[in-house]
Amino acid sequence: MTTIVDKARNDMAVFEEMESAVRSYSRGWPVVFEKAKGYKLWDKNGNEYIDFFAGAGALNYGHNPSEMQKVMIDYIQNDGVIHSLDMATAPRKKFLESFNEIILKPRNMDYKVMFPGPTGTNTVESALKIARKVTGRDTVIGFTNAFHGMTIGSLSVTGNSFKRNGAGIPLNHAISMPFDQYVDEQDSIAYIERFLEDSGSGVALPAAFILETVQGEGGINAARLEWVKKIEEICRKWDILLIIDDVQAGCGRTGTFFSFEEAGINPDIVCLSKSIGGVGLPMAITLIKPEFDQWGPGEHNGTFRGNNLAFLAATEALNNWKTDAFSQNIKKMSSLFQERMKRIVEKFPELNADLRGRGLMLGIGVHVDGLAGEICAEAFSRGLILETSGAKDEVVKFLPPLIIDEDGIEKGMDILEESIQAALEK
């Protein structure tokens, strides 16, 4: 039987011959994609795929939202400024005004908005730099299985050894502490506090903690809200800055705009990227409490921190948050997802599986070596795009666009069931 993958193999030759060996997603999904809309993609042969990947979280509002397309096309046709570094432009002005009125003010948040560059690692690097400058300390505490980006500072607070080793140099001035429930039900809070209290621990008072409330690349590990609150309490007790990395978990992914809202905490610095750009265009922002916004002009900069098309799409995306309807629908779709996940795990006890995540950032931990990857490969051959996550790629990760509907969930999960069955029969 000729599969989707077989038909596309010849189309992949140029990528295999000319592109660096570092390429990743094109290996697992070896087709040439040509069109995308909503929660679906199509390859050049017309094969349709349900997207449970959403650009690794950059497409929370789906592929090519019509309202975002329109504002960008109109702007280009009227010769709007595309590239502007940090010069003042109309799209930048409108984004700042809308973000303040729609996101910050209703949540009683007071932050300066920094545009550090176009990517998630840019916002993380800026957060680490300003935390060290403000406190005069150099150490930052990260957490086991964390992922914060691929540049040196971000790698230093990342847990994954494969990614860390790619730096090629020692990654200093960072310490890893156990994430919530890293060792069964043991209290990692007491462990962390003991390190800070004990002058013999070898741990210097850090400038900051950097935390993902839900670890995406690390395995869809969702910290309990009470644990997140205790981390903030530690920071306040010891005068340590709290950085929340919401690059993947933010912009509605967990059901609220910020992933930490339900914990009721007030971070000093917040990192946003991926879906902050609305339509998948590169954009990142760093939110900094005003008292910590101690940069000198140009002290942190970047050529592509003024993406006006992204500002336009981002502003349009914020309209989804004017009422709580969008948030409530995310929670409804999350419940449907989790119901199907539970039934699947019960149907296939051979997976030795556990369920993970919050909102529409979900996963099935598969505790059989290599099986999660085989399931994802089978799913792709049947028209469902999924990836794995976790230190050993042991988690089947669900990151659908937030605009997915019940039909998309049911069809996607039907494919997943077929894929699990096929993988188990190999």
Curated annotation (Swiss-Prot):
GO biological process, one term: ectoine biosynthetic process
Pathway this chain belongs to: Amine and polyamine biosynthesis; ectoine biosynthesis; L-ectoine from L-aspartate 4-semialdehyde: step 1/3
Catalytic activity, EC: 2.6.1.76
Sequence positions bearing N6-(pyridoxal phosphate)lysine: K274
Keyword Nucleotide-binding: no
Phylogenetic lineage: Bacteria, Bacillati, Bacillota, Bacilli, Bacillales
Name assigned to this protein: Diaminobutyrate--2-oxoglutarate transaminase
Needed cofactors: pyridoxal 5'-phosphate
A molecular function GO annotation: diaminobutyrate-2-oxoglutarate transaminase activity
Keywords: Aminotransferase, Pyridoxal phosphate, Transferase
Family label: Belongs to the class-III pyridoxal-phosphate-dependent aminotransferase family.
Annotated InterPro entries: Aminotrans_3, Aminotrans_3_PPA_site, Dat, Ectoine_EctB, PyrdxlP-dep_Trfase, PyrdxlP-dep_Trfase_major, PyrdxlP-dep_Trfase_small
GN (gene name): ectB
CDD domains tied to this protein: OAT_like (cd00610)
